[in-house]
Regions:
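Short linear capping/connector segments at secondary-structure termini
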Residues: 109-119, 147-153
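Terminal low-complexity tails and localization/encapsulation signals of metabolic enzymes
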Residues: 3-57, 90, 94, 143-169
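Short alpha-helical
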Residues: 64, 101, 105, 116, ...
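Long amphipathic alpha-helix in the N-terminal Rossmann-like dinucleotide-binding domain
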Residues: 71, 93-104, 118-143
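Signature tryptophan residues that serve as conserved aromatic anchors
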Residues: 35, 80, 172-174
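N-terminal alpha-helical segment of soluble enzymes
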Residues: 47-114
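Rossmann-like NAD(P) dinucleotide-binding subdomain of oxidoreductase/dehydrogenase enzymes
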Residues: 145-239
Length: 239
């Protein structure tokens, strides 16, 4: 990566904890391996429930933004599906490594968007990510991707294959619990995905997108579009 690209990446990163009352502004969506501006920006405040103050501003996506993310996921699917299970495991495990490097940031992000005490966010909510990811990796290691149909058909095999692009919509509460339970098994299975987190608690999901990027998840394999049900959720569900 060139110095110019490194500088741009740093500018796009969300910083936690905030300095005083510093406002977080993150209008971009993570599509095809990059943070891209919405096609039709529509600001949405993120409220800290503990103070009822606006702590961040994001943009609500449109049908066109959703279509762009789905197109990126469709284009990335053949190569990701053809990646060996061992290689997929290695790449996805990198998300866990990124979490440990930045887990305090994740705790502050969740505390801010949820209004949760920082100790609860740090010890319970943020820890959903490594807990679930580790258990998915353990289960993954016991999957037989190609196995015999049975004694009655010794020459016939069952092959497990990824199904395609997965649309994922998560609620506001316990955000990393919901995101990890949906995204990680999809990636391990060889599916590509588009995530729409709740517009009420999107900060931790955007930080999760940074983890995916820095872990080396290939462009288009994981995509994130913020938005409401009418603009993004319905469109994502229609694909």
């Amino acid at each position: 990566m060139t110095l110019a690209l490194e500088a741009l990446a740093c500018q796009n990163m969300i910083k936690f904890p905030r300095e005083g009352s510093e406002m977080i502004t993150k209008r971009e969506f993570y599509i095809n391996g990059s943070w891209v501006a919405p096609l039709a920006p529509r600001d949405c405040p993120v409220i800290d429930p503990s103070t009822e103050d606006t702590c961040a501003v994001i943009s609500l996506g449109s049908e066109a933004d959703t279509d762009a993310a789905v197109a990126a996921a469709k284009a990335a699917f053949p190569a990701w599906a053809a990646t060996s299970p061992a290689e997929r495991r290695k790449v996805v495990e990198g998300i866990l490594e990124q979490y440990y490097l930045r887990k305090e940031e994740m705790a502050h992000a969740i505390s801010l968007e949820m209004g949760a005490p920082i100790d609860m966010s740090r010890d319970d909510q943020a820890e959903c990510l490594p807990w679930h990811l580790k258990n998915f990796l353990k289960a993954f290691d016991h999957i037989e991707w190609i196995r015999p149909l049975g004694p009655h058909a010794p020459d016939t095999r069952i092959a497990l294959e990824p199904i395609g692009v997965v649309g994922l919509i998560t609620p506001w509460n316990w955000p990393m619990n919901q995101v990890t339970l949906k995204v990680i098994p999809a990636l391990l299975a060889g599916c590509t995905c588009v995530l729409k987190p709740s517009e009420e608690s999107p900060l931790s999901s955007m930080l999760f997108a940074e983890f995916c990027h820095d872990a080396g998840i290939p462009a288009g394999v994981f995509n994130l579009v913020n938005g409401d049900g009418a603009g993004v959720g319905s469109r994502l569900s229609s694909h």
